[in-house]
Amino acid sequence: YYVKRADFVACHNQSYVRQYDMVQEVKPGGTFLLNTGWTAEGLDTNLPGAMKRYIARNGIRLFTIDAVEIAHRVGLGSHINTVLQAAFFKISGLMPVEQALDYMKDAARKSYARKGDAVVASNVAAIEEGAQKCVEVAVPASWANAELDACASDEGLPAVVTNILRPVNAQKGDELPVSAFAGYEDGVIDMGLTAYEKRGIAVKTPTWKADACIQCNRCAFVCPHAAIRPYLVSEEEAAAAPAGFETAVLKGGKNLPEGMRFTIQVSQFDCTSCG
């Protein structure tokens, strides 16, 4: 079973604050760490009203760290786990922080010694930065009475999305009554529900370079979430497209459709930044 009353909760992706109840299981007086690039003003603008209320009314200590920026700067790419682990030991007080960091550095040296000094140095730097760059945010008193956000409209949505998909995706599936599954006793579920699951969790997305593309479509083939897709557009569609919409002359040999141009489009709401 998952922990339901925690002293420490960390959110490693800032988009999750609007998808899940990230602080509801933090004990009063507990600690919440958010990995984000938002400033204090950005937190006030972007955090849901219910989250701000819970933090203020329950005396939750709020910390932030931009682990994505740190990992990229020290050479770890998208690997933020080491940065956030160091931040955890700095904030939690579970053990003397210097001792914890020394253990982490020793483990990094043993784990990555075969990969070279540069990799070891990057991990050691990530550990040090993770402990140094986590910042406690002064929670404004006004958050205790923060305005609650309007609920998303269910108008026009299929019943399966409203009654099953949304609660399950919000990790509230255990709260669904048996009656919610009436009509689905045989396990068959509606198709095409991906259209209603736009998570928007990517911290960075790929950019198509039209002048370097050989139009092999391999990028679209290997993308596990089908976020990268090739299209053919007519000259008229290309001319009417928004600014920044890139296309290229169609390649590929004989029998090509006339008057069509090639483009690769990336869905930022489906991408997971796996690259």
Report each predicted region and the residues it spans.
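Ferredoxin-type iron-sulfur electron-transfer modules and their immediate structural context
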Residues: 101, 113-274
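Active-site cofactor/cluster-binding pocket
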Residues: 1-170, 238-243
